């Protein structure tokens, strides 16, 4: 059976680079999942993709999954399958650009090599995507990127990261004008107010200890530091996602 290659995204509305993605220069059809649904968390993407694969894809079909708001098709994707197969894996994740700080990125995401996987763009054969998506959804942690990096380090040997950036490249925030040779390029996230607040709520669980240390180092007066620490603690307790906190 000849496998199909399909580009898929998850987007509940038009935002950021969405229109450029679906109306791309190469007339590549993009399957949009999740349209009109309320956003509940990163695992929405895994749920939507798994449902779609189970309903309509064969095990040998190659799925290219990209972020709906930040991704551009940069080159003619006619050689997608050949490029993917050249990596010798069943699932390939894009490499995280570690934009803000290598130390911060690695405080959040499990890593066992010189690269961190980014869940915004990845590709794989349907048979193997079903395996990792089911695993991702079975975990308590609601951050798909944390879960996928843990799988790469501790669970599956059929996953690789696109370190050569031939198929995918995530452009760092500090290098926004970089010219890429990858087929799919993701640019620094377009941040609306809701998306920015959501990011704070989702990632506070990884950084709260470091923030508390920073407060006490920056404010040497015990009363000031204590008040700020209490206020920050209340924000963390009341608002922050703690599903991935160890």
What are these regions (language model features)?
Residues 23-32, 86-90, 153-161:
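Structural alpha-beta junctions
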Residues 1-62, 214-243:
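N-terminal anchoring/stem segment of glycosyltransferases
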Residues 71-112:
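Conserved donor-nucleotide/metal-binding helix-loop-beta segment in metal-dependent transferases, i.e.
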